[in-house]
A protein has these predicted regions:
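Extended ligand-binding regions for polar small-molecule ligands
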Residues: 1-5, 70-71, 76-81, 145-183
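Extracytoplasmic small-molecule ligand-binding "clamshell" domains
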Residues: 1-34, 169
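Bilobed "Venus flytrap"/periplasmic-binding protein-like clamshell domains
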Residues: 1-3, 35-36, 53-104, 118-122, ...
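Extracytoplasmic
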Residues: 6, 18, 25-26, 42, ...
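Alpha-to-beta junction loops
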Residues: 6-8, 24-33, 107-120, 130-131
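Short helix-initiation/N-cap motifs at beta->coil->alpha
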Residues: 10-22, 78-79, 94-108, 142
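Acidic, Gly/Pro-rich loop/turn segments at junctions of secondary structure
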Residues: 35-43
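Periplasmic-binding protein-like
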Residues: 53-58, 118, 122-164, 180-187
């Protein structure tokens, strides 16, 4: 995207729970961190068009467990669309700073299940030797886009043009398949 937009990008690592405040305060110019486009986030920042299509979120629990996700204790990473969804669902939400901690919470019995990005949990379930199972899916969010300050209209236009050109020539789909597998949703 940086090459297509003719920009010299410098990558910065930031904790998830402060990622939007640090964008708004000018510590960096964009967020490209798997951030789902939501109406709530769009009130604070702007988004490019999606560069990754929406994929379902997955509830993952211990294999064989009888879990009603509407009344269970559900772990989710803090400040994610999944945490927001659980908070509004009526289930009991337990939040953790990292996705890894949510999985540990299920393993140690602190939570009945975790709700997280399905693409992330698919490999964990597959590699768990039957310890974990997909116990349900839900679609939330509007795809993944770059977060940009609302005042940065020129940067948004450049990034949207770069994303559009990569969608048009198929290179974005090729990257999605390379990094997320041939089963991943594409444009």
């Amino acid at each position: 995207l940086c090459i297509r937009a003719n920009l010299d990008c410098v990558w910065v690592i930031n904790e998830w729970d402060s990622i939007i405040p640090n964008l708004v305060s000018g510590n960096y110019d964009t967020i490209i961190a798997g951030m789902s486009i939501t109406a709530e986030r769009d009130e604070v920042i702007d988004f490019t068009q999606d560069y990754f299509p929406p994929s379902p979120s997955v509830y993952m629990g211990m294999s064989g467990a009888d879990i009603d996700v509407d009344s269970a204790v559900i772990a989710a990473q803090t400040a994610t669309i999944q945490a927001g969804y659980v908070a509004e669902s009526g289930a009991t939400l337990v939040e953790f700073a990292t996705a890894e901690e949510t999985i540990s919470a299920v393993q140690n019995g602190e939570a009945d299940a975790v709700l997280a990005d399905g693409d992330y949990l698919a490999s964990i379930i597959a590699e768990s030797n039957g310890e974990f199972a997909n116990i349900g899916e839900v679609s939330i969010g509007g795809g993944v886009g770059m977060g940009i300050r609302e005042s940065d209209t020129e940067l948004k236009a450049k990034m949207n043009a770069a994303i559009s050109s990569m969608k048009d020539d198929g290179s974005l789909n090729a990257l999605i398949k390379k990094w997320f597998g041939f089963e991943a949703a594409t444009f």
